[in-house]
Amino acid sequence: MMNTYDNQHREQQKLSENILKTKPLIAIVGPTAVGKTDISIKVAERLPVSTGIISADSMQVYKKMDIGTAKPSQEIRTKIPHYLVDNVEPDEEFSVGRYQKHAKSILNQLYQNKELPLLVGGTGLYVDALIYDFSMNELPKSTKYRQELQQKAEQDGLEQLYRKLEKVDPDAADRIHPNDQRRIIRALEVYYYTGEPISQRQKRRYDSPYNLLIFGITMDRNKLYNKIETRVDQMIDQGLVEEVKYLLENGYHLQLTSMQGLGYKEIAGYLMGDYDLETAVQKLKKNTKRFAKRQLSWFRRDPNIKWLDITETDKSEICDKIIDMILKEYLE
C-alpha cells in the first residue's frame, strides 16, 4: 500500500515535470485588505513544489515604502521568494510596460527552474498585462500632447483633467484614482490619439499564453470596510507618519507617482500642515474604501476569475480549496 509520503512525492514529481511543459500561472487577486497576502503565503507553503510569488502591486515595487504598501515582512520574503517587491527607488518611473517585461522574465526563469509561479496583487492593469500578455506597444505615446496635459494640470489643477476623463471615458475614471496624474494623462492621451477610450481597449480579452488559474478573494463589503479601517489604524501604529516624513525629508516630493499612493499623499498633507492627523486618517480610510470598490469593479468583469468568498469561511479552508483546484488542474 502506498503511504502518504509516496503520494506526496509522486505529486511533487509530476507537478515539477508539468511546469515546463504546460506553463502554469496561478493568480490570486482581489481588493486591498481582503487577505490575499496571507492566503498566498499559506498556499505557497503547502504546495508540493517550490513556489515563487510575483507581486502585482504597483506600490510594493518601490523601496523605502514598506508600511503604507503593506509589504510582506522580510522574514516571509526570505522564506518564500517574492519578486517585483523593492525594485526601484521612489523617484523612478515604473510603467505597466516595464512591469510586464520584468514579470515575463521572472516567469520564464521560474519555469526553467521548475518552480510554480503565484501572481498576487490588486493592481488590475498589472495583472491583465501579464496574464493576457497585452501588447504595450499598441498603446501610442504622444509626447507633445502629454506635455500639454501636464502643463494644464500644473496651471488649472489635476481635477480639471479628471473631469475631462469622466466625460470621455467614465469607466476609466471610475478605476483611476483622482490623484493619479500619470494614469489620468495616459488615458486622455490614448483617447486623443485613437479616438477610443482606454477602458475599451483594456476590455479586449486575448487568450492567455499560460495555463491560467485565477482566484478572486472577496468578502461582505461592510466587513471589508471594517478590515480597511483596522489596517489603516495599524499602519499609523506601525509608523506610517514617520515613514512619510522620512521620504519627504529625503527629497521625495508629492509630484512623484509613488508619493501619490494611498497613505502617502494623505499623511503628507498632515505633515505639511494642511489638516490634523485625525483628518488625515479619515481621508485615508475613505480613499482606501473607494479604491477597494474600484478594484472589485475591475476584477468583476473578468469571466475567468474563480471567486472565493471568505466572509464566513476560515482562511485555511480557502487555502484547501485553492490547493485542491491547483493540483486537479495541473496534475491531471
Curated annotation (Swiss-Prot):
Its EC number is 2.5.1.75. Disulfide bonds: none annotated. ATP binds at G30, P31, T32, A33, V34, G35, K36, T37. The record marks T123, R146 as: Interaction with substrate tRNA. GO terms for molecular function: ATP binding; tRNA dimethylallyltransferase activity. HAMAP family: IPP_trans. This is tRNA dimethylallyltransferase. It comes from Natranaerobius thermophilus (strain ATCC BAA-1301 / DSM 18059 / JW/NM-WN-LF). The lineage of its organism: Bacteria, Bacillati, Bacillota, Clostridia, Natranaerobiales.
